[in-house]
């Protein structure tokens, strides 16, 4: 039976590796009674290379660290002004398939941006969300023990230049775009609030409980 309560953790600005290891720990130690959680965070500049990642897609990392991680997909960039959301969900319990979860995540971004009259869309052959063929949100998940971790990154109000140091998600020349330039949410906080609403509605959560920071382990 699905847990109809979603716990939202507002982590503020946190370095990538500590949050990644906390996600792994939560997933590895959770059981059938554990809460579904949505972690909302902003990371300092970092490139993360997914399991399918090829080194040739990192063109010139320069002074930005590159971290090899255990999610799907290729290389992407995280930095200040980008909303990062990690859904830690028991999809086996809720009987949601992996492809269905990806579709729900993409659609929650599309629905949120539609509130700002932004015509965004997903693409069947390239995970993420796009506006006029420019990418506004990236997606990369990992499923372990029937539970999801990792998640999505939405460009809100950030320096997009570091994306030119890589082939984003393995696509050479892929142009990125962000919410602020399109009249969407102007801050990471606003984007997080709005995305939480559309995400919880799409996945059928009826109660939201908000927390500041990570739970004590």
UniProtKB/Swiss-Prot annotation:
It is found in: Cytoplasm. It comes from the Bacteria. The keyword Aminoacyl-tRNA synthetase does not apply. SUPFAM superfamilies: Class II aaRS and biotin synthetases. It is an enzyme of class 2 (transferase). This is Octanoyltransferase. The active site is at residue 169.
């Amino acid at each position: 039976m699905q847990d109809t309560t979603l716990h939202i953790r507002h982590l503020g600005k946190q370095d990538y590796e500590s949050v990644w290891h906390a996600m792994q720990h939560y997933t590895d130690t959770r059981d059938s009674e554990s809460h579904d959680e949505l972690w909302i965070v902003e990371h300092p500049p970092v490139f993360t290379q997914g399991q399918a990642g090829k080194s040739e897609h990192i063109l010139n990392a320069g002074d930005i660290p590159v971290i090899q991680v255990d999610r799907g997909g290729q290389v992407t960039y995280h930095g200040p002004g980008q909303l990062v959301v990690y859904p830690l969900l028991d999809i086996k319990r809720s009987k949601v398939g992996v492809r269905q979860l990806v579709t729900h995540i993409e659609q929650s971004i599309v629905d949120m941006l539609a509130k700002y009259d932004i015509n965004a869309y997903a693409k069947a052959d390239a995970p993420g969300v796009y506006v006029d063929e420019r990418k506004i949100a990236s997606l990369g998940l990992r499923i372990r023990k029937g539970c999801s971790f990792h998640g999505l990154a939405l460009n809100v109000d950030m320096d997009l230049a570091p994306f030119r140091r890589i082939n984003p998600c393995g696509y050479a020349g892929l142009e990125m775009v962000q919410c602020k330039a399109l009249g969407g949410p102007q801050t990471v906080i606003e984007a997080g609030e709005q995305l939480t609403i559309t995400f919880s509605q799409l996945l059928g959560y009826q109660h939201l409980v908000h927390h500041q920071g990570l739970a004590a382990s």
